[in-house]
């Protein structure tokens, strides 16, 4: 069996980098937003897909998540949530809202 060495950052290093990226996003840095999206989009898409069971809708929810991140980044407080936790919560709420609409139920206002 062949083993492949994968170099990864520790969770703490990644979290610090995520906070730095989000600070840059708050300053209007589109590249930072792209890097943050590239880093987390697969996990967020899987989360949304787990709720919606539809790949296209899951992708739409992830795109909506990063649109919200673009406008709300300056309000994020890393003392309350890790960045990925916030991204996951925005994605989860968006997917649940979409699921409610699909089922003909009213949206829940946040």
Regions found by a protein language model. Give the residues of each.
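Short, charged helix-capping/linker segments at alpha-helix termini
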Residues: 3, 26-34, 45-64
């Amino acid at each position: 069996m062949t083993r492949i060495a994968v170099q990864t950052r520790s969770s703490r290093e990644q979290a610090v980098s995520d906070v730095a990226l989000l600070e840059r996003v708050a300053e209007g840095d589109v590249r930072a937003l792209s890097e943050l999206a590239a880093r987390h989009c697969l996990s967020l898409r899987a989360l949304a897909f787990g709720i919606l069971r539809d790949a296209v809708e899951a992708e739409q929810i992830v795109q909506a998540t990063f649109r919200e991140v673009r406008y709300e980044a300056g309000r994020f407080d890393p003392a309350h949530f890790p960045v990925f936790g916030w991204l996951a919560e925005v994605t989860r709420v968006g997917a649940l809202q979409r699921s409610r609409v699909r089922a003909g139920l009213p949206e829940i206002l946040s």
